Amino acid sequence: MTITLHPGSVSLKQLAEIYWSGEPAKLDASFDAGILKAAARIAEIAAGNAPVYGINTGFGKLASIKIDSADVATLQRNLILSHCCGVGQPLPENVVRLIMSLKLVSLGRGASGVRLELVRLIEGMLAKGVVPVIPEKGSVGASGDLAPLAHMTAVMMGHGEAFYAGERLDGAAALEKAGLTPVVLAAKEGLALINGTQVSTALALAGLFRAHRAAQAALITGAMSTDAAMGSSAPFHPDIHTLRGHQGQIDTAAALRGLLAGSVIRESHIEGDERVQDPYCIRCQPQVDGACLDLLRSVGRTLEIEANAVTDNPLVLSDNSVVSGGNFHAEPVAFAADQIAIAVCEIGAISQRRIALLVDPALSYGLPAFLAKKPGLNSGLMIAEVTSAALMSENKQMSHPASVDSTPTSANQEDHVSMACHGARRLLQMTDNLFGIVGIEALTAAQGVEFRAPLATSPELTLAIATIRSVVPTLDVDRYMANDLKAASDLVASGALNASVSADILPSLEI
């Protein structure tokens, strides 16, 4: 099913659907008129003699050089090919499809001056599954994501490389096999296509969506760990969180209450438990995970604005003037990526402490050492906990802010840059690590709850444990563990663990 986009009001929900489902996107036809109007204005300038940046001048530090009208098409071609300087592995295909969709939104605002032909080609590539090969490295997140977007644009011209029908082909062959025709760029079109924040924004959105999925799963595993440790649900009382007032904290506490409702384990120790308070990793879940939820929601609003923005340069304004500005600078995206990294780091940190609690007989309230049957003969989940610590610590190192590291480029014309692109790209690795941590908690918590038999956990958590056990059986004796850890991580990453509980329990990304 094709997702129809209305530039200026595209929602996080639509963007998440594009990312997770791979459905193609197209612009609503009502935006064609604005695109055509801006394109006509650019064509008018290109036919004249007055120099206007990006239309009939050089670029960056070469902006003062006037280009002959006969060379305008060559100028755009040279711009794209010279800017194809990306290095590293290709970006994931679902990220590239999101990049292309965001570029559609930006062009659809009618301020870029491209012909409708380019919009139709991007739509056609999405519909037919032509995905440009975009190397992951090469952007500093200012003057747009120039190098990576040049690789996207090169395919539209019949250059570069693209994935199509499971093959990696040269751009011309991919278009031909898909029944699409490459374009010859007209005035400003190359600049409009590469001068934007769509790569950084798509990567940040991918990080956001993945972080939120992991955050939801961590509430399930956190509630499960609470029952496994025979922790108290009293700290999740709604009045406590209403008195503080943070919505993420309120929503997280409500989710934990919903997940634990009906637990026989919980009821068994409400009265007469000699422990006065649980460790913070159990008791302060609403405060920590709730703060992360608030942060992700705030970042979501920033990225939703950016996803609907026009970020190339110069721009065709509503009065038909063409004005140079700096919307290509991705500082808001860089800040957003840094904040997501902090949330990812903290969700993993508190999850890892719950894992450590459950494998430690001094803290786990009667569970065997390392959750092993016959500890000593079996090591149980001893090294799974160590792996979770390794993943947590790697995320701590990766969470250093990227946005504070500017460097001058392009002969000091572009003398302050955002570093948004690699700041956002690291979120893919960080969320992979987080999926691994939460997956390990799923294994430790499920094993811990099973040791409490015949006491039963809640109906919701029983469903979650059944989902875990559908991919990883109970650990009765030591076995090769790497496959178990991967299966648990994949379960979290796929969203299947979240889908195992009632849909209305887990807090959404949008308030």
From Swiss-Prot:
GO CC, alphabetical: cytoplasm
Catalytic activity entry: L-histidine = trans-urocanate + NH4(+)
The entry's keywords: Cytoplasm, Histidine metabolism, Lyase
One GO process term, biological-process aspect: L-histidine catabolic process to glutamate and formamide
Residues annotated with 2,3-didehydroalanine (Ser) modification: S143
Cross-link annotation 5-imidazolinone (Ala-Gly), location: A142-G144
EC number: 4.3.1.3
Protein location: Cytoplasm
PTM annotation, UniProt: Contains an active site 4-methylidene-imidazol-5-one (MIO), which is formed autocatalytically by cyclization and dehydration of residues Ala-Ser-Gly.
GO molecular function, one term: histidine ammonia-lyase activity
Pathway of action: Amino-acid degradation; L-histidine degradation into L-glutamate; N-formimidoyl-L-glutamate from L-histidine: step 1/3
Pfam entry (one): Lyase_aromatic
InterPro entries: Aromatic_Lyase, Fumarase/histidase_N, HutH, L-Aspartase-like, Phe/His_NH3-lyase_AS
Protein family per UniProt: Belongs to the PAL/histidase family.
NCBIfam families membership: hutH, PRK09367.1
HAMAP family: His_ammonia_lyase
Descriptive protein name: Histidine ammonia-lyase
